[in-house]
From Swiss-Prot:
Compartments where found: Cytoplasm; Nucleus
Keywords: Cytoplasm, Hydrolase, Metal-binding, Metalloprotease, Nucleus, Protease, Signalosome, Zinc
Classification via CDD domains: MPN_RPN11_CSN5
Membership in a protein family: Belongs to the peptidase M67A family. CSN5 subfamily.
Pfam families: JAB (PF01398)
Domain note: The JAMM motif is essential for the protease activity of the CSN complex resulting in deneddylation of cullins. It constitutes the catalytic center of the complex.
Annotated SUPFAM superfamilies: JAB1/MPN domain
Subunit: Component of the COP9 signalosome (CSN) complex.
InterPro entries found in the cross-reference section: JAMM/MPN+_dom, JAMM_MPN+_peptidase_M67A, MPN
GO cellular component: COP9 signalosome; cytoplasm; cytosol; nucleus
Gene name as annotated: csn5
EC nos: 3.4.-.-
Name recorded for this polypeptide: COP9 signalosome complex subunit 5
PANTHER family the record matches: EUKARYOTIC TRANSLATION INITIATION FACTOR 3 -RELATED
């Protein structure tokens, strides 16, 4: 790992405290110009929102500030109830977040919570009126803070991740301080369901978009290459073999049946092989996901 990349992953708690004490973003509503996301943080978010479809789900991102960039190093899901159009964090989710952050520190992961993410299944990445108010409250009390939105359905149907990162303007300054470079990308509000057009347009001046780039360590690169060479959408969305009780139960019944039939010479070995082939293929697929899902994505 080169020094520049190593520095991205290194977290200096004292330096981070100094940046927060200085808080230059309080004097410049457009202080932050970009967001950088690690590969594992992105995959964890994508896995969570994909498995949550068709409901909206949410979580937090952890990381640090580097110049005018917010660096997202990790993410974790929140146990919140969502609907097909809205998700809200309750007190239990806040308690969970505090406990999770405490446990992270106990294993020397000191990165701060620097934002939240949630999903917009099949209606793009932008901030609704509720999202804008939530983000404004977060920036008021927890800054630095960024809002990340992912569309899992569109992501799984295309070769790229449908994602956006946003920060809100202070109340009363909507759009009046925006520079030309901060306007939303034209693609942001394309192909919206008719029920979402009004909400999306009504609050577009209340926030700005931040360009997103990605980075990965050598270990993370192996994960992304693994997914690229396989059916990545299936690997992301399906439960692991350790969680698929129905598959395990059906496989156990099939194996018991084949052992009984072949043991009593009632079924030729060739026939037993043919009957078990589908099960073996499915098992092979699930086994290929264990390292990725149950080790690298384990929360």
């Amino acid at each position: 790992m080169n020094n520049q990349l190593e520095n991205v992953f290194r977290f200096d708690e004292e330096k981070e405290r100094a940046k927060i004490r200085e808080s230059p973003w309080k004097h410049d509503p457009e202080f932050f110009r970009s967001v950088k996301i690690s590969a594992v943080a992105l995959l964890k978010m994508l896995r969570h929102v994909s498995q949550g479809m068709p409901l909206e789900v949410m979580g937090y991102v952890q990381g640090k500030v580097e110049g005018a960039s917010l660096i997202i190093l990790d993410s974790f899901a929140l146990p919140v109830e969502g609907t097909e159009t809205r998700v809200n964090a309750h007190e239990e989710a806040q308690e969970y977040s505090v406990q999770y952050h405490t446990l992270c520190k106990s294993v020397y992961r000191h990165e701060n919570v620097i934002g939240w993410y949630h999903s917009h299944p099949n209606y793009g990445c932008w901030l609704s009126g509720v999202d804008v108010e939530t983000q404004r409250q977060n920036q008021k009390y927890q800054d630095p803070f960024v809002a990340v939105v992912l569309d899992p359905k569109r992501s799984l149907e295309s070769p790229y991740v449908n994602i956006g990162a946003f920060r809100t303007y202070p109340v009363g300054n909507d759009g009046s301080i925006r520079t030309k470079s901060r306007h939303h990308p034209s693609v942001l509000f394309k192909n919206l369901p008719s029920s979402k057009i009004e909400d999306a347009g009504a609050h577009a001046e209340a926030y700005y978009s931040l360009p997103i780039t990605y980075f990965h360590s050598k270990a993370e690169k192996k994960v992304t290459e693994f997914l690229r060479n396989r059916n990545w959408s299936r690997s992301i969305t399906e439960c692991s073999i350790l969680q698929n009780n129905e598959f395990l139960h059906d496989s156990e019944k099939l194996i018991d049946h084949l052992i009984h039939e072949t043991g009593n010479n009632e079924l030729p070995v060739a026939s037993a092989y043919e009957q078990s082939k589908a099960c073996c293929n499915e098992l092979s697929t699930f086994l290929s996901q264990i390292d990725v899902q149950d080790k690298l994505f384990k929360e």
